[in-house]
UniProtKB/Swiss-Prot annotation:
Residues covered by the POTRA domain: 82-150
Encoding gene, per UniProt annotation: ftsQ
Membrane topology: Single-pass type II membrane protein
Protein name, UniProt field: Cell division protein FtsQ
UniProt-listed InterPro entries: Cell_div_FtsQ/DivIB_C, FtsQ, FtsQ_C_sf, POTRA
Organism for this UniProt entry: Dinoroseobacter shibae (strain DSM 16493 / NCIMB 14021 / DFL 12)
Function in brief: Essential cell division protein.
Amino acid sequence: MRPLSFRRRTAQARPDPAPSRLSYRVQRLLLTPLFHALIRVGLPAFVLAFGVGWLLQNQELRDELVAQTIALRTQIEQRPEFMVNAMSVSGASTELIEDIHEVVPIDFPVSSFALDLEAMDRIIGELDAVAEVDLSIQAAGILAIEIVERTPAVVWQTRQTLEILDAEGHRVGPIESRAAHAALPLVAGPGGNRAVAEALRLLEVAEELAPRIIGLQRMGERRWDVVLTEGQRILLPEREAELALARVIELDQAEDLFARDISVVDMRLPDRPTVRLNPDALDALWTIRGLTNDRIE
């Protein structure tokens, strides 16, 4: 038989197989994906950032790094394949090309990295005569600018200036003399620029009167007068002006209205058109009426 003391020593030497609570939590933490990611990515990133930060504490080293970075960037930007040597403008008149060179002065050759095409597009697009603009850098170092100019539609006369407008009323540019653009119809009066489309429709309706028409005058920024030669006028209503003008044209074709001694055809009340005689014709009419009355009496 074995002694009892030996059994007690054996029982005391046996280790406890259950881990401690702290050990269990540490083992679970080591097995989590987040901890693996921190060890694989976070720790190297921290070491790298710490090393770079420690190196950049040296002012001379920082200055050298900045200088090398600038030199490398300049070297890349100045490579021949990135250089722009000339500008090409298409679709623009000579005057507009001069304006473009004035608003976007470029000292060639220049690196394409130094050109802000978006800003240039905005600046050129703000020119009055430009409807559309497209910029691109093409092969052989050419800055290509494609322009769509506004098409002149009317001459707008204000108290101070003469300006050319397109069919939408956008300003194309000022002019010094009406004679230089005599082929364009004349529009006058405040607010005329905001009703160019209507003015063009009226002129189309009044094509039969074209040789007599001097222009259209905006009245009170709400309606049009058609100004004719010999001091004659057609006063149009605010609404359905085209229909009212068409009625006047029909009347002229039937009765040769504007060959008569009249000054105004008032269509502001379309249901009650009014014809106003010239002063001389009115005096003659009153004289005739007076003579007639004398004879009756």
